[in-house]
C-alpha cells in the first residue's frame, strides 16, 4: 500500500507512534519455529523481517533525535532506513519489541514538541540530496507500514501445526483392517 497523500507532521507522528503496538499485536504468541518461517528461498525469515523493522526503526529514531538535539545535518538515510543486510533476531522477541516501543515513545514525545521550523529543517543525504525532517518521517512511515503489511501477510501464511503422532523409529505403523461388514 502506497501512501498517496502527503502526510502532515501530526499524521506522520501518529503513524510512527502506532508501529510498536501494531508489531506487538501481529507477533504475539509467535514461537521460534514460526519466527524461522521463510516463504521462499529469496525471502527473509519472519524473524529476520521483524528484526529488520525493529532495528531500522531504532536507527531512524536515533537519527531524528541526533538531528534535533545535536544539529546533525548529514545522514545516509537509505542505510539507516533500509540497510542492505537483514539480521535475524538476536534476543527474545518480546524483549526486542518492548525495547523498540520504549525508544519510539521517547522519539514521538520529542516530535510532538517540534514546530514548523524544526519539521522543515534540512538534512543532507548523499543519495537523496536535501530532505526535511518531515520528509524523513514520511519515508519512515511508508517503510514501516509496508513491512507491517508484509509481517501480517506472512503470519497469515504460516503453516498450521500438524500432529504427526508418536515417533515410529522408521517402521511402518500397523493399520487396522478395514471394516467391510
Language model segments and positions:
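Acidic/histidine-rich alpha-helical segments that form the ligand environment
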Residues: 82-121, 135-140, 150
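Short, contiguous alpha-helical
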Residues: 1-2, 13-14, 35-80, 122-181
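Small-residue-biased structural context
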Residues: 12-15, 20, 86-93, 105, ...
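Structural signal for well-ordered, non-membrane alpha-helices
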Residues: 20-31, 57-61, 101-115, 145-155
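Long, hydrophobic N-terminal alpha-helical segment
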Residues: 11, 16-23, 27-34, 41
